[in-house]
Amino acid sequence: QIHSGLGNQMFQYAFYVALKHNQSNTKIDASIYRHRPSHNGYELERIFAVEPVHATIDERNRMADVGKDWFSVFRHTIGWKRKTHGQLVIEPNPSHGWCPDLLHCDNCYLQGYWQTEKYFAKVANQVRMDFTFRQPLNAIDMALANKLTKEKSVSVHIRRGDYIKERRRADYEVCTVEYYRRAVEYIQAHVDSPVFYVFSDDPTWGQEQNIFPKGTIFVSGHEGVDAYIDMQLMSLCCHHVIANSSFSWWGAWLGQRENTITLAPSTWFRYRERPDIIPDNWIKIDAE
C-alpha cells in the first residue's frame, strides 16, 4: 500500500522495488488517495520516472472482501506468519528493528512505512534510477542548481509546520535550535568555506535563531505541488543536514556527490525508537 506524503511514498515504493526483485508479480495499491487525500496526494508518477504496476480494482476489492473473514494482522516484533490463503501484514514495530523476512513475503497485502535503507539496499541502484525527476527545472531553479553543484553547498532542512501542532509536538519536535547549531559547527569544522542553503516551511524561524553564518541562502518559492523541487535541489548539494523528516532523508540519500557528510538527529521521534532509519555512513548529532 502507498500512503501519506511524498517522502513516505518513496520509502514504500523502494520497498516495492525490493519485493518485486524477489516476487515479480508484486503490485502497488494507491487507491487510498481516492478516499483520503493526504498532503499533495499520490505523487510518485507525477514527479519521478517510475511506472509501478498497480493492483486492479478487482484485485483490491478481492483483498478487501476476503480480509473481513480471514486476514490476520501481525504486529509482532518477530514479523509475520504464512497462511495458505494469504494475509494482511502490518509493519512490525520499527522500534525493534527491520524485519528482513518480509522481503520474501508471498501472497500478502503489506501496510507500513518501511523507513530504512536496509529493505532496499540490494536494489539501491535501481531505486536511484527510478527516482529521476521528470520535469526540467525552470531558469531560476536551474541557476540555483548550477551554484549548488559548483560550491561546497550544504542543504539544511527545517521542518516545522505540522510538527509543531499541539497533537504532534511532543513526539515530533526533535530538531531543536541546539541541533542545528551543533550541525553547523560540525560542518564548519570539517568543510572549508561551506555555503549553507536552508530549505524550510518556516524560513522566518530559521532566520531569527542566529544559527547560520553570514552568506546563508534561504531557498523559497516551492510550495504545494512544487514542494518536491526542494528535494531535487537538496540532492544536488555536497553535504546535508536533515530534519527528522522522510522528505529531507531522501534529499540527502539521492545525492551523488563524493565524500558527502550527512548529519541527522540522533533521535527521530522523542518517544519512539527508530534504530534503522539512519544509514550507517551518516553521522548522528545530539538533538537535545
Which sequence ranges carry the predicted segments?
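Short amphipathic alpha-helix
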Residues: Q12-L19
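Short, aromatic/basic amphipathic alpha-helical patches
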Residues: P37-A49, G206-K214, R274-P279
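A structural signal for isolated positions on well-ordered beta-strands in alpha/beta enzyme cores
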Residues: K27, S155, V195-Y197
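A short, glycine/small-residue-rich beta-strand->loop->alpha-helix junction that serves as a flexible
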Residues: I2-F11
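Leloir-type glycosyltransferase catalytic cores
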Residues: R270-E288
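Donor-binding and catalytic core of enzymes assembling or modifying cell-surface/extracellular glycoconjugates
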Residues: L6, E185-R272
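A short beta-strand-loop structural module common to alpha/beta enzyme folds
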Residues: N25-R36
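Secretory-pathway luminal glycosyltransferase catalytic domains
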Residues: S38-V191
